[in-house]
Amino acid sequence: MSAASFAVSTFLFHQFRLDREHLVDIAAHGFGAVEIFALRSHFDYSDPAAVSDLVEWLDDTRLELTAVHAPTAERLVDGVWTGNLSLASTDAAIRERAVAEVQLTLDLVRVVPFRTLVLHVGVPADIAAATDNDAGAARRSLDLIVPYAAACGVQVALEVQTNALSTPDALVGLIEDAADWPPAGICLDVGHARLLGDPVDAIETASGLIVASHVHDTRGSRDDHLVPYDGSIEWARALLAFQKVGYAGPWTFELAASVPAITTLARAAHARQRFEQCLGINDELMSQ
């Protein structure tokens, strides 16, 4: 299994401005790829200088940019998220701003190639306002975004989240109902799937549509974004389920911001080694 099969999301550093050392640290811990968390206060995807720096840093570190996570807010300031960008908002101004920001993020591909755009459909239920999670508004947004992404050569991956629009069943239904869309897929976020129930059930439900993954753990009641094996998820079962539905990566570690982040990266590298061992064992079992 290649190093590029395992990525780290820069969500790990999202409270800081992205810099070269963040990518150096990811590469130094044996990861071959990165997912950029698009947030203007972290990585300003609208700034040509920031984009140029990213291209240089990726070249320096030999990291592959496998995916970009579309913005869900405009900024994080002193620990406070500002500028809601819900694609499912009934507020037309918010929704149109969100669509415009996603399209601006997709324009990155003209300078730095990536295959997948991870997208939130609405807002997690525990923090959502009454206007944030409307199915009709979400569909109108996606009717614009999915074709725009396809024209850029990028596939949209709708992320499993803890709201009614983003359960595995809901996302499968949304994609199947949108017969006029270019191919879209699902980002199976294992931590979120655990909060909804059994991740194995989620993986089986999304079978055939999984094009991306977020791997992180949870103790079962909060979206903790822990290093795998630090929470309640049975990873051997989950990884075998992924293999049974034909998903082979990338496995993107989307981990909570921590200080120092390098400690989290070291523990993530150990978890990656356990993944590699588990996937190898599962390969042997499935070939018998």
Question: Whereabouts are the PLM-identified features?
Answer:
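Aromatic/hydrophobic pocket-lining residues that form the small-molecule binding cavity
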Residues: 19-20, 51, 95-102, 138, ...
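Acidic-and-aromatic substrate-binding clefts and catalytic sites of carbohydrate-active enzymes
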Residues: 11-19, 37-51, 124-129, 161-168, ...
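N-terminal pre-domain/capping segments
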Residues: 1-104, 110, 150, 197, ...
